[in-house]
């Protein structure tokens, strides 16, 4: 748990509920969340999937390394994925990525993606365009800047997308 997530009640709550029940709980630190100098690729599948896959692999390696020590823990064949909001999106993206790209490495027992923005082009965009006012005015620019940075690089000219006051 990073310094950022250690102060997050939801992160601590999930850890406190699942770990004493015998589950190995892995909470990935997505790109840009624990490091303010990096942008977070919000609702972009590949970086989320990569973070989850690498975290699971790392914990599996640690289990093997600690096999003969007093700190050992045991993996079984069950893999549960769960997430809420951006984590819900990450859960569904990771499930899809694991099933398509790593079918021999990961077998998912159950997946619980909750309250994530799953269907941007089919649901979210038409909704945003139909509303005269959106209650969370930061959200659309957050999604847009995330996608621009990820797909076009950090030298994006935001003046092409926003009024000059907001582009600066």
Predicted regions and their residues:
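Alpha/beta-hydrolase active-site loop
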Residues: 42-67
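Accessory cap/linker subdomain of secreted extracellular hydrolases
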Residues: 114-168
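Alpha-helix capping and helix-loop boundary segments enriched in small/acidic/polar residues
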Residues: 2-9, 39-47, 82-86
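Extracytoplasmic/secreted envelope proteins and their assembly/folding machinery
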Residues: 15, 49, 53-56, 91-95
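Primarily recognizes the serine-hydrolase "nucleophile elbow" in alpha/beta-hydrolase
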Residues: 58-134
